[in-house]
Design a protein with these regions (language model features):
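Bilayer-spanning, highly hydrophobic alpha-helical transmembrane segments
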Residues: 12-16, 227-258, 271-291, 573-602
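Actuator/coupling domain of P-type ATPases
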Residues: 22-27, 37-123, 136-143, 150, ...
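Residue-level signature of catalytic and energy-coupling elements of molecular machines
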Residues: 52, 80, 101, 120, ...
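Flexible metal-binding regulatory segments at protein termini and peripheral loops
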Residues: 1-30, 102, 126-129, 209, ...
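Cytosolic catalytic headpiece
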Residues: 111-112, 126, 308-530, 563-566, ...
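Membrane-cytosol interface motif
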Residues: 63-68, 108-123, 298-324
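Juxtamembrane helix-loop transition segments at the membrane interface in multi-pass membrane proteins
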Residues: 53-61, 97-110, 289-308, 616-627
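Membrane-embedded alpha-helical bundles of multi-pass transporters
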Residues: 2, 20-29, 51-55, 73-78, ...
Length: 627
């Protein structure tokens, strides 16, 4: 509790004690009783009266403070002092509870996102470390990150090796090993060795700064449910005030005209009860709190949602489109099959190809050298020639070796076998004879198949894969992962056209999400209903372009984000239905004179407390991550 909340708690206790003492006293003169009951009322309710008067002064009277002030002052005017005090006391109890709940949610999110560094260490000429504000550190400055400290600014390690804890950014507990030459991003915690880092960005442009801005501004983009409640309260509160006024005067006037007793006091009491019941606090407070909790819970899992509107749209997503490379696959090439001719060996074929490709920097060449797994003896390789669009030729141990595609083999007068192309084929010829081939492909991520299955379980109707790869490759990956539809051989511009077709084909109330790695995906991310950037740790483009940012490259996080969104939306609608149903029933009973002021207190404070308790569930995602 804050100091202000503790002070309010003491005021509530004091007011309750005074009311109990006054209730136990023998009957007193009416004027004395009024003055005595005004003491506990003002002790706990003065700030409500003050806010109501300020609202009237500013010509914005219709809020919960105005409703409570009119209801309680009216109760005092009717001589119902205990009920008047009870209404204001329990209203303040509800407000206190709501304040504590909201504060707890905000503190939980702040703790989850407590990644802002307080300082950066700069090494002076005498070797001593000076702590400076991260905002003052320029690009290219050498900073020192000691064990236990957060990396304050993005940069490259120039000296040292260590293990980094990235849990605050990715939600993953598995640490990451780094050494000289590796890039590091701000917000990670250095767990072991001392690191010297050359900064590559200013603090304002670093990853931690962008993430903090994203989380802080997430409440600006409100969901449809939030906007509905705001508009509803704007119309609802004045309407119930006029309704209460009509209830207080029209029935007794009609009764008078009919020659029956008017009983003005009874009808005014009903109107005051009507006012207490009608307070919209449960909705106005619990709906934003639910979305706030959902966004905070997602942040704890390394999923950054830029606003409650995207959380709501994610819950309504029924079509998910993937960019293959870097999203469903690792985006790195790997030798997955080695096929030597009869009489040859896999090791000798890989060795010949790796040595021939030893001078090439092409990703295919790098994957072959990785498969070889040994140091390249450059002295064994001579006369290297790289042939654009074909491959390479070289002499290895004095023998001519060629490694490349079928066109290179044809150029050498060699026939190659008919190989089903489910990846990149590198044919190898040694000493003028065909020696076999290597199959190289982009490796599917370990969790991709399960991620697609989880999306189906989360309510996704159709999954689509877009890729620039050839038809056989796209078909094989699609079949392996269980994707419903794929489109192959696409250029970057073709992806936007394909998205337009998918948007036109979906049902009106369905949302379409696109999942990319944030690289060159900005046009597509901005066109779809929900743009999701995966593996955005350190990617400025992804953080800027996407609506939902996954801080690591685990595709399973997409289904988790949808489960969080669906659970949050469910909580929101539970609160709306619950609050409106209880209030509607109590309003009817109050208007009929069946429900008294005590029932009104429950309908207001009780419903608000239960709705806020339900809303705080959105913050906790442990049971969702285990599915």
């Amino acid at each position: 509790m804050t100091k202000k909340q503790k002070k309010m708690l003491y005021r509530i206790i004091a007011a309750l004690a005074l009311v109990l003492v006054l209730k136990l006293l023998p009957p007193l003169p009416a004027s004395v009783e009024l003055l005595l009951y005004c003491i506990p009322y003002l002790v706990v309710g003065w700030d409500v009266l003050r806010k109501a008067l300020l609202g009237i002064k500013n010509r914005q009277p219709f809020d919960e403070c105005f409703l409570m002030a009119v209801a309680t002052v009216g109760a005092f005017a009717l001589g119902d002092y205990v009920e008047g005090c009870a209404v204001i006391i329990f209203y303040q109890i509800g407000e206190l509870f709501q304040g504590v709940a909201v504060g707890k949610s905000r503190r939980s999110i702040s703790a989850l996102m407590d990644i802002r560094p307080d300082y950066a260490n700069i090494e002076g000429e005498d070797g001593k470390l000076e702590q400076v504000d991260p905002d003052e550190v320029e690009i290219g400055t050498l900073i020192v990150v000691q064990p236990g400290e957060r990396v304050p600014i993005d940069g490259v390690i120039v000296e040292g090796a260590s293990t980094l804890n990235t849990a605050a950014l990715t939600g993953e507990s598995l640490p990451r090993d780094v050494r000289s030459g590796d890039e590091v991003i701000s917000g990670c915690v250095n767990m072991s060795g001392l690191l010297k880092v050359r900064t590559t960005k200013e603090f304002g442009e670093s990853t931690v700064s962008k993430i903090l801005d994203l989380v802080e501004n997430s409440s600006m983009k409100k969901a449809r449910a939030e906007n509905f409640i705001t508009r509803f309260a704007r119309v609802y509160t004045p309407a119930v005030c006029y309704g209460a006024l009509a209830l207080a005067f029209i029935p007794p006037i009609v009764l008078l005209l009919m020659g029956q007793p008017a009983r003005f006091g009874d009808w005014v009491y009903r109107a005051l009860t009507f006012l207490v019941i009608s307070c919209p606090c449960a909705l106005v407070i619990s709906i934003p709190l639910s979305f706030f909790g959902g966004i905070g819970g997602a942040s704890a899992c390394g999923i950054l949602v830029k606003g409650s509107t995207y959380l709501e749209e994610l819950a309504d997503t029924r079509v998910v489109v993937f960019d293959k490379t870097g999203t469903l696959t690792q985006g790195t090439f790997k030798v997955v099959k080695v096929c030597p001719v009869e009489g040859g060996t896999e090791d000798s074929l890989v060795e010949a190809a790796a040595l021939a490709e030893s001078w090439s920097k092409h990703p295919i060449s790098l994957s072959i050298k990785t498969a070889y797994g040994k140091d390249i003896d450059a002295a064994r390789v001579t006369d290297v020639e790289e042939l654009g669009g074909h491959g390479v030729t070289a002499r290895v141990d004095g023998k001519p070796v060629a490694a490349g595609n079928a066109r290179l083999m044809a150029k050498l007068g060699l026939t190659v076998p008919d190989v089903p192309q489910t990846g990149t084929i590198v044919h190898v010829a040694i000493d003028g004879k065909y020696a076999g081939y290597l199959l190289i492909s982009d490796v599917v991520k370990p969790h991709s198949a399960q991620a697609i299955k989880s999306l189906k379980q989360a309510g996704v109707r159709k999954t689509v894969m877009l890729t620039g790869d050839a038809e056989p490759v796209a078909k094989a990956v699609s079949a392996e992962l269980g994707i419903d539809e794929y489109h192959a051989g696409l250029l970057p511009g073709d992806k936007v056209d394909q998205i337009e077709k998918l948007l036109a084909a979906k049902k009106p109330k369905e949302m379409l999400a696109f999942v990319g790695d944030g690289i060159n995906d900005a046009p597509v991310l901005s066109r779809v209903d929900v743009g999701i950037a995966m593996g955005a740790l350190g990617s400025d483009a992804a953080i800027e372009a996407a609506d939902v940012v996954l801080m690591d490259d685990d595709p399973a996080k997409i289904a988790l984000a949808m489960r969080i969104a669906c659970r949050t939306k469910s909580i929101v609608y539970q609160n709306i239905v619950f609050a409106l149903a209880i209030k509607a029933a109590c309003l009817l009973l109050g208007a009929l004179g069946i429900a008294n002021m005590w029932a009104a207190i429950f309908a207001d404070v009780g419903v608000m407390v239960l709705a806020v308790l339900n809303a705080t569930r959105a913050l906790y995602t442990k049971n969702l991550t285990q599915k």
